[in-house]
Amino acid sequence: MPETVVVSRGGGAPYSKGLMAQSLSAIGLPLERAYELARRVEGRLDALGAERIEAAELSALAEDVLALEEGDAAVSRFRHWRALDRLDRPLVVLLAGTAGVGKSTLATMLAHRLGLTRVIATDVIRQVLRAFLSHDFMPVVHYSSFEAGAAVAESLEDRDVAGFELQAARVGTGVSAIVDRACRERTPLIVEGIHVLPGALQDALGSRCVAVEALLVVEDEDRHRAHFGLRGGERPAARYLERFAEIRKLQDHLTERARAAGVPVVDNATIDIALAEVMDLVLSRVGRVSSSTAS
């Protein structure tokens, strides 16, 4: 049977089970299940026998399959995911968390689910500052976040937190500039790193973008410690484990900030569950923005 061409915005391409499965996995379905439903959508197309179908009609067909197989909640998430393409402002996801909680992995997986190409790690910004600014001029950027206490006065009550806050403020200037440019250029973006202070950019972002914030943590200490054993190359586990108490202290500090700012805290007990939680945050936010725009 000839392939059905999906028509959208004046162009067309044959129906792709892979693309449909990616769309369905974006709403939280396991990939195997997403492919199964994509095949069922293909079966519906074959039954129709149409040579061409509008993208909106294909989406309605997919919603019918979802409603039958997964229920109304899945249909709602699918509609929110589709609304991403119709946003009048860029999506900016801010993912905070201390060392070893899985921020980079989660950000990469989230970008794939959302079809985004720009992921910025705040530690890269710190490394750039470190390369251009001498230790004498700005010592705090020459330390890892959990060692930044060495750059502040010994008289301070909690040097670990004070040093981290100072470093986050310095790096935060670069983070703000990157997010500001993304808003101006309407470029979707994920920013991940410990220097994303929960709630710090809420006033600056305002209505310029569709912002989603989350703090990623690992509540179980043994599981958190085990994460460092998975690291290799230039980031040996021993260095992190020697400073594990400081890393946990910064996690507690960030958690307090997140709760005070109303930023969701996501426990990365397993990466799949954490990804699903963050995806729900994104889709819920997009759904609220789409509803307010429509009304």
Per-region residue spans from a language model:
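Extreme N-terminal, non-catalytic leader segments
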Residues: S25, P30-V92
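Glycine-rich phosphate-binding P-loop
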Residues: V93-L114
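Short beta-strand-centered segment that lines the nucleotide-binding/catalytic pocket of NTP-utilizing
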Residues: L116-F132
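Short glycine-/polar-rich loops that comprise or flank the Walker A/P-loop
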Residues: L116-T117, S207-V212, A261-V263
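Loop/turn-to-beta-strand initiation segments
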Residues: T117, R184-V191, V212
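Conserved nucleotide-sensing/catalytic segment adjacent to the nucleotide-binding pocket
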Residues: A131-T187
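A glycine- and Lys/Arg-enriched "phosphate-lid" helix/loop adjacent to the NTP-binding pocket
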Residues: V210-H253
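NTP-dependent small-molecule kinase module
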Residues: D252-S295
